[in-house]
Amino acid sequence: MAKEKYDRSKPHVNIGTIGHVDHGKTTLTAAITTVLARRLPSAVNQPKDYSSIDAAPEERERGITINTAHVEYETEKRHYAHIDAPGHADYVKNMITGAAQMDGAILVVASTDGPMPQTREHILLSRQVGVKYLIVFMNKVDLVDDEELLELVEMEIRDLLSEYDFPGDDIPVIQGSALKALEGDTAQEDIIMELMHTVDDYIPDPERDTDKPLLLPVEDVFSITGRGTVASGRIDRGTVKVNDEVEIVGIRDDIQKAVVTGVEMFRKQLDEGIAGDNVGVLLRGIQRDEIERGQVLAKPGSIHPHTKFKGEVYILTKEEGGRHTPFFNNYRPQFYFRTTDVTGSIELPAGTEMVMPGDNVTIDVELIHPIAVEQGTTFSIREGGRTVGSGIVSEIEA
């Protein structure tokens, strides 16, 4: 547990890179950290190379990013926590947890390819998990000689964004080469700086739900010898500080109480973690096996575990990557809440025999484990590793 205090003088924003596999998300992440370290040197702005961001061994063996890398950097205006979201379709599950943490995202599209299946999927996921602001970085422009082709690709990206209710005509599109910027090409470094100015200006300072009761979805749990158990994740709303009493809610039938003995972010101690911060929370009296991913830390009494609710859902079409066939009563997919999948059964409204791809319907859901949910909690419906629907809890039933 580090002792250095975390600087809060600049607004803090969570962003990330999304887009199709091999379009240059990780290279762009490396370029942003490297160019900012050259142009705006500070304790925070440290260059990260491709291999350190692409860190987990299975990623490098397969040449695909799997886990979610967190890096930090700052512009003159802001402090950023940046997630390099996985690109490969098998790892969409991780993408969902990553995208859920973003105030805005940079959609990376290779100019050589244009939008690809995962470009569409990531735009859809951003829409589902509430990422409101996207900025487009058209990468690899150095490999395209034809100006008209670049214009065509840009139009195609804008149309795709509009299709998913993003303001496709107004979204900023920056064209450049992340690799050339990384290699020190001055003109391309300027473009990376232009991208960051655009991110500063286009993504508004997030409105934080600091006045609401604490809700922190647990992403990871580890123990520190002699100190206790740490639960980490992004604070969804509210605040947490030392000596606060919290409840651990969901998955298990009983609710546990714990006392917070430490809060840290980027290895620095915090007086208080607030909504939007990625923090580790040290809990007194909790064993490593008494808390798990998928649970939440919450202000006592503020949220309860439920297994039955009504949900308003949209079922994806085949073209959107959803099911090709309808589903019927008692369909049992996975429901993805915040950081975890839970199996549940679906009861259709009286008189509805089946639900077709593209339908919008109210369903009754019964989960096999209780989850901390309330009216307004969003979820994805998943089956065999792919998203087939998206929904919001409209009413708690049990």
UniProtKB/Swiss-Prot annotation:
It is an enzyme of class 3 (hydrolase). CDD domains: EF_Tu, EFTU_II, EFTU_III. Mg(2+) binds at residue 26. Residues 84-87 are annotated as: G3. InterPro entries: EF-Tu_GTP-bd, EF-Tu_GTPase, EFTu-like_2, EFTU_2, G_TR_CS, P-loop_NTPase, Small_GTP-bd, T_Tr_GTP-bd_dom. It is found in: Cytoplasm. Pfam families: GTP_EFTU (PF00009), GTP_EFTU_D2 (PF03144), GTP_EFTU_D3 (PF03143). GO terms for cellular component: cytosol. Its main location: cytoplasm. GTP binds at residues 19-26, 84-88, 139-142. It catalyses: GTP + H2O = GDP + phosphate + H(+). Monomer. This is Elongation factor Tu. It comes from Streptococcus mutans serotype c (strain ATCC 700610 / UA159).
